[in-house]
Regions:
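Local beta-strand N-terminus motif with an aromatic residue
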Residues: 6, 22-24, 133
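Conserved class I S-adenosyl-L-methionine
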Residues: 54-94
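A short glycine-rich, Lys/Arg-flanked "PGG" loop and its adjoining helix->strand segment in the class I
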Residues: 39-51
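A short acidic, Gly/Pro-enriched loop at the edge of an enzyme's catalytic core
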Residues: 14-26
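Conserved SAM-binding strand-loop segment of SAM-dependent methyltransferases
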Residues: 2-15
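Short "lid" loop at the C-terminus of a central beta-strand within the Rossmann-like core
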Residues: 32, 60-65, 141-142
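A short SAM/SAH-binding and catalytic strip from SAM-dependent methyltransferases
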Residues: 24-38, 61
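Rossmann-like AdoMet/SAM-dependent catalytic core
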Residues: 101-193
Length: 193
């Protein structure tokens, strides 16, 4: 049963194989922070979104990723040995779950063996949004400290201090324990406003 109004794309963002204003909705999670230039990657994919379309990105958070960064340092300090893999498997909350060997290996490679990794703050991504004609709708975590679905997000930014505190709280939640991924949601503005 094919869906004729959905397009999935697996390509190099920097080849920019998509025409501008093509998608109503762009979801790019777990990608930009593994590219040669996260901001440039965002600039490219933001052009793909139609006016009034939504864009959701998931990037590693500078603060929320600190626990993972600590485990990464241990893994590298122990020279990525078999012992290091076993130790990290005990320390990483996601790897302690009852997962298949394949899923554990995929998680391990993504979290500990990826050659390129960048981390970004919510404010940094909010600046990307502003520079690319995208209105900030919300994020997970957010400065109101309440979970909101995309349809409930109102663009409330809160204060800088509240945004920083929300990111610090990632260290004490499942968000920080499982990789420190931060979700940021925006809406493409009308070019003539």
């Amino acid at each position: 049963n094919a869906i004729d109004n959905v397009a999935f794309l697996n390509a190099d963002i920097f080849n920019n194989e998509v025409e501008d204003n093509f998608f109503d909705f762009v979801w790019c999670s777990g990608v930009l922070h593994h590219t040669k230039d996260s901001k440039k990657g965002f600039e490219i994919i933001s052009r793909w979104v139609k006016e009034d379309g939504l864009i959701i990105i998931g990037v590693y958070n500078k603060i929320g990723r600190l626990r993972t960064n600590f485990r990464q340092a241990i893994y590298k300090l122990l020279r990525k040995s078999v012992f290091a893999m076993k130790l990290i498997s005990m320390l990483d909350p996601h790897l302690r779950k009852n997962l298949s060997h394949e899923k554990k290996l995929a998680w391990f490679r993504d979290q500990y063996d990826h050659p390129v990794e960048r981390k970004h703050s919510i404010d940094e991504v909010m600046n990307w949004f502003e520079e690319n004609n995208i209105s900030y709708l919300g994020s997970i975590p957010n400065s109101s400290f309440e979970f909101k679905t995309v349809s409930q997000m109102s663009g409330y930014k809160g204060t800088y201090l509240a945004r920083v505190f929300a990111q610090i709280l990632m260290l004490f939640s499942n968000l920080g324990g499982e990789g420190g991924l931060c979700i940021i949601v925006g809406k493409k503005n009308n070019a003539f406003k």
